[in-house]
Amino acid sequence: SNDSPTTRRHQFPSPSHPSESPHAPAPLTMTQEEAPAPVNFWGEHPATESEYYAAHGAEGESSYFTTPDDAGARRLFTRSWRPAGGGAGARPRALVFMVHGYGNDISWTFQATAVFLARSGFACFAADLPGHGRSHGLQAFVPDLEVAVADLLAFFRSVRRREEHAGLPCFLFGESMGGAICLLIHLRTSPEEWAGAVLVAPMCRISDRIRPRWPVPEILTLVSRFAPTLPIVPTADLIEKSVKVPAKRLIAARNPMRYNGRPRLGTVMELLRATDELGARLGEITIPFLVVHGSADEVTDPAVSRALHEAAASEDKTIKMYDGMLHSMLFGEPEENIERVRGDILAWLSERCTPTSTS
């Protein structure tokens, strides 16, 4: 079974009764809010991850990767997903290296897209970012995105160096802040490393609509020097703003690894710095890319994705805008919307893969 101890270890109590003893008698009737939180985002059945993967035509496993870093090795929690039943000789169509967004992680709803791609013939790999999920660092504290870029690159390259992956095309895939990280990876590596990038509602520049007004940035800059970990930056409820289907908001909120506090000062300052850099360097982007964005997204600005598509030097670049969709395009929308976006991503990736030798 692919259920590693890291996956099985977390049996989470209900969020509404955090201090209750596991042996306390259960109340006779429970509302939906009081029911024990599911251990998996899809609910009670199937009971294990490996059964869920198998039911969706995929296989998966989780482990820890330790970065080969001179300044002290760091541990990242990682996952991989492959097409089911791939024997020793079976090769995936390509490798997809996936990066999640701010406050999120790779073990909850983010997995659904990876499982979909694995079922479609791709081998997918992802890691919890520093300060997220089960990886190193204070929760939701990202004082230096360069550390995240270096950690992910070390993991992605270790996967790519495996003998069975020789010669396979390698794609980057990023959601929201993960989209920004994918572009930073591209700007810091040679173009021939990547066959392309899929950017889902990427955070390429903080929208003027939500960027703090003067004198707030100046005050934040000053305070963040002394107290970078303070979780005090005012922000809207991200789940409310991102997820359209109300029942899915409850699922997102029940992610036991999710950070629900206010953004930390140092994280916000670093995101402003990194997105300012990206905004200024859009013309240097040469990687083939697909950018998908919902027209009603209030978390990352669809106008910035249009600017990216306009300004990028890439010869192969595609933008798809989805009328009325919000920020969480691959989970928070009605199923038919998710299918549309998935289908467009799959078609784009498939066109850029070398056909299998059997075709």
Where are these regions (language model features)?
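Short beta-strand/loop motif that positions the catalytic acidic residue
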Residues: I285, V291-H293, D297
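Catalytic nucleophile-loop/oxyanion-hole region of alpha/beta-hydrolase
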Residues: D105-W108, G133-L168, E336-R340
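Conserved alpha/beta-hydrolase
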Residues: F116-H136
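An N-terminal hydrophobic leader/cap segment in hydrolases
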Residues: S21, P27-D70, R75-A84, P234-E240
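Short alpha-helix in the alpha/beta-hydrolase fold that links the catalytic acid
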Residues: I287, D301-E310
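Catalytic active-site module of serine/aspartate enzymes centered on a nucleophile-bearing elbow/loop
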Residues: D323-S359
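Alpha/beta-hydrolase-fold enzymes
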Residues: E175-R264
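The serine-hydrolase catalytic nucleophile loop
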Residues: Y102-A114
